[in-house]
Amino acid sequence: MEKIIYELMERVENKVNERYVLAKLKFVKSQNIGKENLKKLIEGFQNRDTINNIKKKIKMSPVSMDWYEKTEFDNFMDFFTRNLKETKLNEIKENSKNTKIIIPNECVIESIGKTSDMSSIIRLKKPTNTVIEDLKQVGVDDTYNFVNMKLYVSYYHNIHSPVSGKIVDLMPISKDLRIFGKNSLWIVKYNTKIGNVFLLLVGESTIQDFDFNIKTNQNVKIGDRIGNFNWGSQTVLLFKGDFEKIKIKKKNHYFFGEHIL
């Protein structure tokens, strides 16, 4: 199996960065997913990973590429995990320092509501009452607000801390719970001045999809980078507060740093 993996990985040499290749290698070796499935996985990376595709995605970006450290990219993952210029990052963090909660990532808001009715989180794969019971296991109750955020492929995929506080836990959620179908799920739990805040990171089902830049018991400031998706499409923020004071609107596009409360 290991020989097959290495042979297939050679086919994407120079297509994805070394760190990404190693992450995928580690995953497929641990999962024993089989030769044919592995081949499909690699071919999927190859098909997505073309210079023309990158150029198309750049044109689709709603924000200026001048915000980023690089405007030209060697491969798709180089584009997908691009970093903001330090001056732009500092500007966003400075504008957010007196805010309670911010948008943690570039997104379109799919839904906003209260956990007493999560039916508008449109990609939940289980009945709402069952999802609530699952989330109660990690400390979420039906008095929380939620913001459900969609990340498109052209978007900036670094994720930043939506609040200032202490990282209480980084929880991988078993796919057996199937909150988001077979997709992977991490929950970041914060202790803050406004109570516990939860950030759900929903990734692609077949790959190791999130690299953390934080650890449990670490104190973070609002806007700090907490990690990046290697492949992912959804985040959900859960927090308490006056629902009527939430500043963002459903179906609108937002960049990281926009004020929620």
Task: Give the ranges of each region predicted by the language model.
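Contiguous, well-folded functional domains in the mature portion of proteins
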Residues: 1-261
